[in-house]
């Protein structure tokens, strides 16, 4: 039985000289990290851009008494679609973290380089900030109108920096009188723990029930489920989404948009929850005696047969062969 031939894109599709020249520069190790960071920023941009847009319709629609513009159900779908677009467009370049807690977990459990992790996290937060800036400018007229209506009604101070106010489109806040900090912590921790278990299962090569092609949909569904069930009690799920969007809210509205003690819960709780989920999955659900599913094996081979990876492996083999052929001193 003959082996499946390895065909790279350049073998079947010719690019122009300018693009080939750019690709040679872009793919140098000294430069390629910037492409990976760009992909991480773009992925978070997708996730945040679609989610915030739907949230803006919900918040502004409620203030302006325009029913039917959005709903929690629609917001969950918007974030889910953003995740699908992020993974589909960007994961092949960066590996598809799109969340600081995932990057930190990969650094601890999968040997991801710490310096690269810092770059990824900065890029992720930047992607969320840029998405916030665009959403704000696209909705600015209605946001300003909503602020004026709140001031005219005399409820600006009590509504503006809550989930029901224009600032709540971007930064995450507790619903006044409806949630305590300990319960917000519990809500965030449990949702992030469950979400991380789903992510780890989607990455498990022996998980034949979740082939690689289905992993984006499974992960997106987990995010949507958390939003549908627990957004009202307050969840963040993603440090980049929280920090990047909160920084933007601070840029527009100043310190009043900070969010108080809850901001620490929204930004940080997902990290220990994800790490604990990774430990639980590795200890209780990973089984090295299981067979690697064929779809996962194909996915792993595609990654391993990347042209630069193969070239590097061949170069390393040549160096090893050259070293072994040298006469050893007696």
Swiss-Prot record:
Motif (NPA 1): 99-101
Motif window: NPA 2: 238-240
Pfam families: MIP
GO molecular function: glycerol channel activity; water channel activity
Entry's induction text: Expression is low in vegetative mycelia and up-regulated during development of the basidiocarp.
InterPro entries from the UniProt entry: Aquaporin-like, MIP, MIP/Aquaporin
Membrane topology recorded in Swiss-Prot or TrEMBL: Multi-pass membrane protein
Subcellular localization(s) per the UniProt record: Cell membrane
Residue ranges of the TM segments: 41-61, 72-92, 125-145, 158-178, 184-204, 208-228, 265-285
Domain description: Aquaporins contain two tandem repeats each containing three membrane-spanning domains and a pore-forming loop with the signature motif Asn-Pro-Ala (NPA). AQP3 has NPC/NSA motifs which is in accordance with the fungal aquaporins (NPx and NxA).
Function: Water channel required to facilitate the transport of water across membranes. Also mediates the transport of carbon dioxide across the membrane.
The protein's name: Aquaporin-3
């Amino acid at each position: 039985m003959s082996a499946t031939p390895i065909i790279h894109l350049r073998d079947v599709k010719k690019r122009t000289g300018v693009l080939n020249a750019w690709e040679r520069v872009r793919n140098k190790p000294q430069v390629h990290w910037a492409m990976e960071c760009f992909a991480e920023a773009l992925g978070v941009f997708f996730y945040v851009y679609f989610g915030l847009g739907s949230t803006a319709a919900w918040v502004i629609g409620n203030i302006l008494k325009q029913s039917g513009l959005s709903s929690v159900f629609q917001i969950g779908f918007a974030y889910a679609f953003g995740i699908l677009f992020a993974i589909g467009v960007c994961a092949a370049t960066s590996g598809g973290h799109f969340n600081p807690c995932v990057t930190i977990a990969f650094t601890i459990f999968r040997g991801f380089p710490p310096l690269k992790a810092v770059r990824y996290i900065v890029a992720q937060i930047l992607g969320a900030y840029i998405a916030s800036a665009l959403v704000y400018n696209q909705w600015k007229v209605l946001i300003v109108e909503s602020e004026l209506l709140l001031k005219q009604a005399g409820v600006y101070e009590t509504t503006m920096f809550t989930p029901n106010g224009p600032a709540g489109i971007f930064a995450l806040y507790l619903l006044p009188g409806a949630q305590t900090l300990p319960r917000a912590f519990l809500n965030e921790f449990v949702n992030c723990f469950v979400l991380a278990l789903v992510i780890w299962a989607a990455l498990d090569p022996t998980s034949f029930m979740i082939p690689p092609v289905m992993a984006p949909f499974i992960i997106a569904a987990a995010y949507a489920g958390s939003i549908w069930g627990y957004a009202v009690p307050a969840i963040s799920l993603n440090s980049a989404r929280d920090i990047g969007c909160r920084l933007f809210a601070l840029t527009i509205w100043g310190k009043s948009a900070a969010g108080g003690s809850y901001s620490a819960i929204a930004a940080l709780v997902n990290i220990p929850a994800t790490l604990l989920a990774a430990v639980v999955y590795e200890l209780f659900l990973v089984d090295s005696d299981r067979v690697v599913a064929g779809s996962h094996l194909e996915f792993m081979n595609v990654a391993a047969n990347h042209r630069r990876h193969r070239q590097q492996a061949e170069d390393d083999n040549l160096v090893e062969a050259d070293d072994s052929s040298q006469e050893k001193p007696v």
